[in-house]
Amino acid sequence: MAHKKGQGASRNGRDSKSKRLGVKVGAGQKVSTGSILVRQRGTRWNPAQNVGRGRDDTLFALVDGIVVMKKTNRTYISVVPEQL
């Protein structure tokens, strides 16, 4: 015979891993081709000159240069090539 009553399992104890979203490179910083600038869900930041957008809306640099952020009705991120 059991000496303890049966205990129900807890329904807690689950959590999802963080996705590490956000801006990875600030304005004025140097970047190389292929560098990830922003990881996002949706288009909170939009690609401008010399910036590509991946299928998961990640923004990345298409050329070596310096990051520029511009805010009008939307926030745009571009990369200005460095002058030699």
From Swiss-Prot:
Q: Which Gene3D superfamilies does the record cross-reference, listed alphabetically?
A: 2.40.50.100
Pfam families in alphabetical order: Ribosomal_L27
Origin, by domain of life?
Bacteria
Q: Which SUPFAM superfamilies match?
A: Ribosomal L27 protein-like
Keywords from UniProt, A to Z, are:
Ribonucleoprotein, Ribosomal protein
The molecular function terms in GO held by this entry are: structural constituent of ribosome
Instruction: Locate the region Disordered.
Output: 1-27
One GO CC annotation? cytosolic large ribosomal subunit
Which biological process annotations from GO are given for this protein?
translation
Which InterPro entries is this protein grouped with? Ribosomal_bL27 (IPR001684)
Family classification: Belongs to the bacterial ribosomal protein bL27 family.
Kindly provide the name given to this protein in its UniProt entry: Large ribosomal subunit protein bL27
Question: Whose protein is this, by species?
Answer: Chlamydia pneumoniae (Chlamydophila pneumoniae)
- What lineage is on file? Bacteria, Pseudomonadati, Chlamydiota, Chlamydiia, Chlamydiales
